[in-house]
Amino acid sequence: DAMLRIAPMPHASILVIAAGLIWLCIWRSTPRLAGIPVMALGVALALLARPPDVLVSSDARLIAIRSGATVFLVTQHKPDRFTLEQWAPVWGEVPLTPAQCTENTCRLGPVLFAAAPPADCTAAVLVSPAELTGCAGLPVIDRLYVYRNGATAAWVKGAKVTLRTDRAAQGSRPWVVPYPQL
């Protein structure tokens, strides 16, 4: 394979690198060298970017959970090849490892995967391919959540969970499935 996979860069990083490169190309004298530290800042911003801890597909059948340096893949069906190809660059060269779940639950770092309502709700975020209830105050990414909001990415930092959904990123466009009326 003659391809090197790298994690995607944040928009700010690309803009800073482009600004430094433009500065470097426009000027001819020594002030143009000021573009080099600006480009270095853009590269530093790219290196500081953190990939999501959880990715959930738009149908909640495919879930990837990052725990430390390992990315676990949780699925109850055959994984969708297209989705896996789209997710591959998110973590760079880190391979996806199938999660070994017992009794329909997995605790992978601060994330709890549950195929049925869990008895223990002590996690930063609860992820499930089924509809779940019963864990008050805990962010739940389940089948109903992704039905309403689309594919979801989650970043976990301590007890704080940041969610980013496909519907929030895409907005109301002709090609986006309309928000379901329940």
Protein language model regions, located:
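Helix N-terminus capping/helix-initiation residues
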Residues: 10-11, 80, 142
